[in-house]
Amino acid sequence: MLPQEKLDLILRRYDEVSARLNEAVEPALYVQLSREFAGLEQVAAAIRDYRSQMQEVEGLAAMLADPTTDSEMRGLAEEELRDAKERLEALEHQLKIALLPKDAADERSAILEVRAGTGGDEAALFAGDLFRMYQRYAESKGWSVEIISANEGAAGGFKEIIAEIAGRGVFAKLKFESGAHRVQRVPDTETQGRIHTSAATVAVLPEAQEVDVEINEADLKIDTMRAQGAGGQHVNKTESAIRITHIPTGTIVFVQDERSQHKNRARAMALLRSRIYDEQRQKLDAERAADRRSQVGSGDRSERIRTYNFPQGRVTDHRINLTLYKLDKVITGEALDEVIDALTTHHQAALLADSESGGL
C-alpha cells in the first residue's frame, strides 16, 4: 500500500500552488511556482485516478460481502472486481513511477555536442547524420535548435558541432544519448563494397543558469582571434572569435559562429557554465553510483552505447540490449522516441527497484 499521508500532502501542496498561481506574484516567483506546478500536476492526476479506482474496488468488495446480494449480481460483481483490481494494480504502478525522485535538470533545455571520432571523413559524415537526427527530432517536439559552434568536415558532415536545443523537458528526453555511437556501412567512396566502421561521440548537457554555477572573472583567461573557416583560412577581419579557459577546472570553450564578439562571448559563457554544471552533476552522480543500480549504462561519455548497422537496417542500444530493424526511421528522428522511451522505462524500473529495496 502507498503511504496515504504522503499522498494527502502532495494534493494539498498542488492545491496551494494552483491557488498561488492565480494571485498576483513577482515574475521570478511565478516562474518558480509554474515549474513546481508542472511537476505536481502529473502526480496529482495519478493520485486521483488511483484513489478513484480504489473506491471502485472497495465498493465491489462491499457488494460481495453483503449477504443480501443475489447470485446474478454477485457473479457480475466478481467479474468486475477482477478487472477493477487489475486496473488498480496498473494505476498503482503508474503512481509509483510518478512519485520517483525527479532529476532537477529534467525540465531544462540542453546543450548538444556531437564530435566525429575514429573513421576520418566517414566519422564526420556520421556526426552530421546524428546531428540531423536530433535536429529533426527536436523540430517534431516543437523545440528550437540554435547552432552555437560548428566545424565542418572536409567531405561534409561535422568534425564537431555544438547546439542549444531549447524547450520544456529537452534534457529529460535526450540525456541518455550521451556516449559513443558507432556506425557500420559502405561509404560512397568504397569501390569494393566493404563495410567500414566509424564512430562519433554525443554529449548532452543540461543548460545551466547563472545561479547554478558561480564563475569569477578572475578565474577566466579570455582570448580573442579572427574567425577561421574550413582549412584554417581567416573568414573575417575583426577578432570576433572567443576562446575562454576556466583556470580552476581547465575547461576550454571556443565560439566563432557570430560576427559579433559580444554575441560570441555570451554564447561561450553560456556553454562554459553548462559544461562546469554538467561536470559537477557527473561528480555527484559518480559518488552516488556505488549505492544505486538505477543508472542506464556506466554514464561514461566514452562508453559505446549504440550501433547503427546500415546493411542490416539495424539499430542496437547495447545498454538495454534493444534492437530495432528500422534504422531508416531512427536516423531521421521519426522513430527515435522508441529508443528513448525504452531507455526511460528501463531507468524508471531500476529506480523503482532501488526505492522498494531501500536503495534510495
UniProtKB/Swiss-Prot annotation:
Which InterPro entries does UniProt cross-reference here?
A: PCRF, Pep_chain_release_fac_I, Pep_chain_release_fac_I_sf, Prokaryotic/Mito_RF, RF-1
The listed locations are: Cytoplasm
Respond yes or no to whether keyword Protein biosynthesis is given for this record: yes
**SUPFAM superfamilies registered for this protein in UniProt:** Release factor (SSF75620)
Where are the stretches annotated Disordered? 283-305
Query: Looking at the UniProt record for this protein, which Gene Ontology cellular component terms does it annotate, in alphabetical order?
Result: cytoplasm
UniProt keywords (A-Z) are:
Cytoplasm, Methylation, Protein biosynthesis
Highest rank taxon of the organism: Bacteria
Spell out the molecular function terms from Gene Ontology: translation release factor activity, codon specific
PTM text:
Methylated by PrmC. Methylation increases the termination efficiency of RF1.
- Which residues are recorded with the post-translational modification N5-methylglutamine? 233
Q: Which family does it belong to?
A: Belongs to the prokaryotic/mitochondrial release factor family.
Function summary: Peptide chain release factor 1 directs the termination of translation in response to the peptide chain termination codons UAG and UAA.
Q: Which PANTHER family match?
A: LD18447P (PTHR43804:SF7)
Q: What is this protein called?
A: Peptide chain release factor 1
What organism does the record attribute this protein to? Methylocella silvestris (strain DSM 15510 / CIP 108128 / LMG 27833 / NCIMB 13906 / BL2)
Name of the gene encoding the protein in the UniProt record = prfA
